[in-house]
C-alpha cells in the first residue's frame, strides 16, 4: 500500500483557541473534527491506510476503522490535502 503524506501547501497544527486541529493555507483555515485530526496527524509519509487503522484501533480500542478512514482519505485527496507516495 502507498504511504500518505500531507500536501506541503497546507500547515497542519493544533489550534489551542479552537481546541481542534486545523489546516492552514494561504487563503484561510480549515477546522477539523477529532476524527479528521487524528487521521491527518498520522499522514506523515511513512504510514499507509493499514498502519493508520492499526494505530487508531489501538488508541480508541475498536475493531476496525478502515472504512471510515478510507472515506475520509478520499475526501482529503479530493480537496488536495494529501497525496500518496
Language-model regions, residue ranges each:
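Acidic, low-complexity/disordered tracts enriched in E/D and polar residues
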Residues: 1-41, 60
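Long, charge-rich, low-complexity alpha-helical segments
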Residues: 29-85
